[in-house]
Swiss-Prot record:
Cofactor dependence: [4Fe-4S] cluster
The protein's name in its UniProt record: Ribosomal protein uS12 methylthiotransferase RimO
Domain Radical SAM core: 140-369
Residue ranges that the Swiss-Prot or TrEMBL entry lists as coiled coil: none
Its EC number(s): 2.8.4.4
Residues binding [4Fe-4S] cluster 2, per UniProt: C154, C158, C161
A cellular component term, taken from the record's GO annotations: cytosol
One GO term of the biological process aspect: tRNA modification
Subcellular location per the Swiss-Prot or TrEMBL entry: Cytoplasm
Family: Belongs to the methylthiotransferase family. RimO subfamily.
Record domain MTTase N-terminal: where: 5-116
Function per UniProt: Catalyzes the methylthiolation of an aspartic acid residue of ribosomal protein uS12.
Amino acid sequence: MGDKPTIAISHLGCEKNRIDTEHMLGMLVEAGYGVDTNEELADYVIVNTCSFIEAARQESVRTLVELAEANKKIVITGCMAQHFQEQLLEELPEAVAVVGTGDYHKIVNVIERVELGERVKQVSIEPTYIADETTPRYRTTTEGVAYLRVAEGCDYRCAFCIIPHLRGNQRSRTIESIVAEAEQLVSQGVKEIILISQITTNYGLDIYGKPKLAELLRALGKVDIPWIRMHYAYPTGLTPDAIAAIQETPNVLPYLDLPLQHSHPDILRAMNRPWQGRVNDGIIDRIKTALPTAVLRTTFIVGFPGETQEHFEHLLEFVQRHEFDHVGVFTFSSEEGTPAYKLPNQLAQEVMDDRRYQLMELQQPISQKKNQQEVGKIVDVLIEQENPESGELIGRSGRFSPEVDGLVYVKGQAKLGTIVPVAIHHADTYDLYGQVVNN
């Protein structure tokens, strides 16, 4: 035990990457390795990288260069390792191993081989692995919240997206496996489970022959957990049955993360999402009718090649009309290896930046209005942090997802990791403010 090296993990990227990080930590701890939060003291640093867009790659490269300059032994995992395996080994002598997105479960074996002097390249050409409830896991989120992956990979081929190349085709877990992991998380004190995959509404299509999201939600409804939240609902997959399951299952929050990407049919066709333009409005209206309290989050890409001022104004009008609760806006990032990389009529970065600014400026008063509607209500809040200086508590209500949405700043007494009633007395564009209601 004592002679095994210590390992630190630097986590970058999305919550799917976070789950991979947590499984690697779990496997290393189970194998007797010491895990150190201090990268300077650790013998090895695993950098779980992101390669989704250029900005994410730059952050990953900065982290790798800083560690290389500090002469750390680096194990590179994640999407960048899958994407640029040869290049990374050539350019970073300090990299002792690269491990692909479908190979992180071999991390203990990789470290053992490195310890014997091998420089390891463990990258499957086509990632096929998916962890389940039997895979060790060491959670890194706050005590009350956990991500639960229902599927990995993606069968869609949106023109701007490199994810299928980096994470493979969709592979779903069984309903039984997901429910078993949910039960494990409840036993650890988790109060909120966030279901994730690339397209959660396509869950089960590969193993059951048709999407089974509705059945999954109903099965999770029998688990003793207060909040179940769903990320990444592809709009065309929100069938009447899926919406009914959200309606009927009390612990499933009426929170829908719909990555719409654009509103105009021309741009959606160019994005290789041709069917979406016909259904955007109808699905949003159907959700609002069936789930009047639904919280809607979406993301848009501005500056996709060929986006004219007319296309952009269509998007502005769409956002103004539908009044989403939360909106994320990205400028188009031209990714080598995607169809969009070679499209004509690429827009200048300053035009894209200006459009992003305009769309965010349009959304801010809408977000403010939506938050303002919470003032005067008593809402359940999951308490996650305490400010040691002021004693103020920080948490989230059901309308806020971790990291991407706002927070609730709370006065009063409550234990971390518990859900308590809070009277909301103030709101701003992104956050809410309130007082614990003592029974």
